[in-house]
């Protein structure tokens, strides 16, 4: 069984974690490998988080939706980069479809309450915030003259000029985008009004063209800073990428708004912090100097 697990996680590492950092021990990585583990730790330490459950079959998610209502999110228990996630789910038909599709990624799945707000990745090292980014789904801004397709081409050209590829991806002009636009009665030939933001997909992941904005760490409210720093000792980690949604924003105290801490990443993808579409490129070399000097136990064992 042990060798089988090593084979599985080795495959996951090569297939899905290419380019991810590796500064935590095996015991730390094991302690936050699944979303369930993170949620349990959040619950034990009064960290605001979404109510959620692990499920294998079809009954439990429907009972969860009946108890807590919509919107909700369904995602694999073990995953990253928003792979296999489905949200916002607003009715039972969408829920059934999500239950079927989520099993493509992992046999055990998560159903949670969904919060609409600002999505952040905060990278924390011991006693210090390393980097703060806000993540957006792919979007374009109308100029009153250009079609959505033209705006996408312009945005992709700009990303290429900014040398964001291949870390940041181009926005796809594919069936997925067509279907998403159709939900808003839009298509590639539609012409948005000047200043109108047109969202092209619902996920903040990089693969469909998600957008990264770096933020000044000092813009984070002090209460929020203390909350993020509080988390890393719970996992005995050297570094964590912590994902959270703030209803108003990270510059407002978490006590004055709805906040959901989603998960912790023991191998955060740090490359994206160096290729922002918006905000300043961050200087993080002194953090890497410290991290690279660490002796990591069982670094290459999964």
Model-found features: residue ranges?
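Short, composition-biased local secondary-structure segments
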Residues: 1-17, 31-32, 195-202
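C-terminal active-site "lid" helix and adjoining low-complexity regulatory extension at the edge
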Residues: 4-11, 19, 206-219, 233-237, ...
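Active-site nucleotide/adenylate-binding loops and adjacent lid/helix of ATP-dependent enzymes
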Residues: 11-172, 221-225
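Acidic active-site catalytic centers that drive phospho-/nucleotidyl reactions
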Residues: 75, 243, 263
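Hydrophobic, Leu/Ile/Phe/Ala-enriched alpha-helical segments that form helix-helix packing faces
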Residues: 99-106, 228-235, 291-295
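Active-site "cap" helix and flanking loop/linker of ATP-utilizing ligase/carboxylase catalytic domains
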Residues: 148-183, 280-302
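A long amphipathic alpha-helix within ATP-dependent nucleotide-binding catalytic cores
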Residues: 158-251
């Amino acid at each position: 069984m042990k060798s089988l697990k090593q084979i599985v996680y080795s495959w996951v590492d090569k297939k899905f974690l290419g380019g991810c950092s590796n500064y935590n021990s095996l015991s730390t990585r094991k302690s936050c490998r699944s979303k369930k583990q993170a949620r349990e730790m959040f619950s034990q330490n009064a960290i605001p988080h979404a109510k959620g459950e692990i499920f294998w079959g079809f009954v439990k998610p429907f009972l969860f939706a009946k108890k807590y209502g919509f919107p909700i999110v369904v995602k694999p228990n073990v995953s990253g980069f928003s792979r296999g996630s489905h949200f916002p789910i607003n009715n039972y038909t969408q829920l059934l479809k999500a239950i079927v599709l989520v099993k493509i990624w992992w046999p055990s799945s998560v159903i949670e309450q969904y919060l609409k707000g600002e999505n952040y990745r905060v990278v924390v090292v011991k006693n210090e915030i390393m980097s703060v980014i806000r993540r957006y789904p792919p979007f374009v801004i109308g100029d009153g003259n250009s079609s959505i397709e033209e705006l996408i081409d312009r945005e992709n050209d700009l990303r290429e000029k900014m040398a964001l590829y291949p870390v940041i991806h181009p926005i796809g002009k594919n069936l997925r985008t067509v279907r998403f636009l159709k939900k808003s009665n839009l298509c590639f030939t539609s012409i948005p009004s000047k200043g109108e933001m047109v969202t092209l997909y619902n996920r903040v992941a990089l693969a469909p063209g998600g957008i990264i904005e770096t933020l000044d760490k000092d813009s984070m409210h002090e209460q929020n800073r203390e909350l993020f720093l509080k988390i890393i000792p719970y996992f005995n980690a050297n570094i964590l990428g912590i994902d959270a949604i703030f209803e108003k924003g990270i510059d407002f105290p978490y006590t004055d708004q709805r906040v959901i801490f989603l998960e912790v990443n023991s191998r955060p993808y740090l490359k994206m912090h160096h290729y922002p579409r918006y905000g300043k490129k961050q200087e993080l070399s002194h953090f890497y100097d410290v991290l690279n000097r660490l002796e990591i136990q069982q670094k290459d064992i999964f």
